[in-house]
Amino acid sequence: GYFLPTILTTLGLIFYDAWQLSAVTEEEGRARFFTKIFRTYSSVLFCCAAGIIWLCRPVMHVMKSNYYYAWHFVPFLTLASTCSCFNQFLNSAYVVNKKSTHSLWTMLAGAVSNCIMNYFFIKWWGPIGATVASFFGLGIVFVLRALDAHNMIGMSIHPGRVAVNFDVLAGEALLLLAEPPLYGLWTGLLTAAIILFNFAGVWAMARMLLPKLLGRRGRVLVSAVDNWIKK
């Protein structure tokens, strides 16, 4: 079940390695800088998470056919991995303010709540309950770190936007697990909604990366898409 969610955590690690230096060296306008980067980063992660949940069944069938049943664990593990990536990003606020003990306390709060929820959720829902508990436990860490980041550096995660994304992703996960008629269509529509909702953030990252990866062709593509958006 960890095979697909690991894609998100790997992306998070790559981003964090590149981001950490900028987080420490950027001093002027730090709150605005952190807020802008988080918005772009979270947009990409939300879109990736939606796609993983939507495609996890066919992908698990093709690539991990002997463990196909494990697809049941993918939806909420994907949500948990998304929270884990956010927690790693917000840890930068502790690094730049030299308050590493806050990182420890937030993780401890998440671990304790995770253990308590595991006890009850596994009783109620079996093994899937453990994935739900992981999501909520890491979600608690995310909320605590978001509050700390706001207090320490004035950063905003735009909680309304984040809540909408997580609500839609949770709805997609529940639809997939419930397996109603045409569940593939409904989860696909929710994935499309997530992508449209986060398009501005994803495109902001693409505008930076495409010219570096594709050179002149990338710049032409960026210009064409920008003109299309303006129309």
Predicted regions and their residues:
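Membrane-proximal transmembrane or re-entrant/amphipathic helices at the cytosolic face
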Residues: L177-K231
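Membrane-interface junctions at transmembrane-helix termini in multi-pass inner-membrane proteins
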Residues: T78-A109, A149-M155
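Transmembrane helix-bundle signature of multi-pass secondary active exporters and lipid flippases
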Residues: G1-L13, D17, V44-C48, A80-S84, ...
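Membrane-embedded alpha-helical segments of multi-pass transporters/permeases
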Residues: I7-T10, A49-R57, C115, Y119, ...
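Helix-loop junctions and terminal segments of transmembrane helices
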Residues: G1, P5, T9-F38, N91-V96
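Interfacial segments at transmembrane-helix termini and the short loops linking adjacent helices
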Residues: T35, I52-T82, Q88, I128
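Interfacial transmembrane-helix starts/ends
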Residues: W19, E27-S43, C47-L55, W71-V74
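Membrane-interface helix-loop junctions in multi-pass transport and translocation proteins
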Residues: W71, T101, L108-V143, M155, ...
